[in-house]
Curated annotation (Swiss-Prot):
Keyword Magnesium: yes
Gene name of this polypeptide: rnc
Entry EC number(s): 3.1.26.3
PANTHER family, sorted: RIBONUCLEASE 3, RIBONUCLEASE III
Similarity comment: Belongs to the ribonuclease III family.
RNase III domain residues: 5-127
Name assigned to this protein: Ribonuclease 3
Active site: 44, 116
Catalytic activity: Endonucleolytic cleavage to 5'-phosphomonoester
Gene Ontology annotations of biological process type: mRNA processing; regulation of gene expression; RNA processing; rRNA processing; tRNA processing
Amino acid sequence: MTPPMNKLTSKLGYTFKETELLNLALTHRSANGKHNERLEFLGDSILSFVIADELYRRFPKVNEGDMSRMRATLVRGNTLAELGREFDLGDYLKLGPGELKSGGFRRDSILADAVEAIIGAIYLDSDLETARSIVLEWYHGRLEEIKPGASQKDPKTRLQEFLQGRRKPLPVYTVTNIKGEAHNQEFTVACEVAGMDTPVIGKGTSRRKAEQAAAETALEQLTNG
């Protein structure tokens, strides 16, 4: 059963005047009728502009090459899919029977496309400045962490590439504990990696940070062990 839509809009930080726009943004092309690809096209362009503009302002002395690499890191599919999981977007997607059966609600590409479509929907429901402020709020932590010239691959990406290069299955991340009040929570995540006897534990102030911490530890153990 789909959770109440107000839970999603609360996580997004935006309440739609036209709820049909949000419904359309959540509708994959595998479902019959109208779908989210036009909104995705629009949202992709808005996201790219907003992130480019923010990087230009934040890093006045950084060259075009570094800014392009930072933008690519922030707007790539797996970053958008991470955002989608933070919003529990998979619980709200409207998919056709085939995609539902094959677990499309967990697929990175479908989650990433839906995030872009939601950005397009927010823009159409409001204006560019509102869409910009929402996107920058979503990206606040990532923008604070990103640095020019540094490796733009986060620990989860590096762990995934390490395992893929050795033809091993991808790691599985599970939230095992959340403690504290909503504004001051600590997440504990277990990361299961093929070939490691016990799951690796990571902690952080968000699910994403806990997963990254677990991936970093797993990488250290795999490369040093």
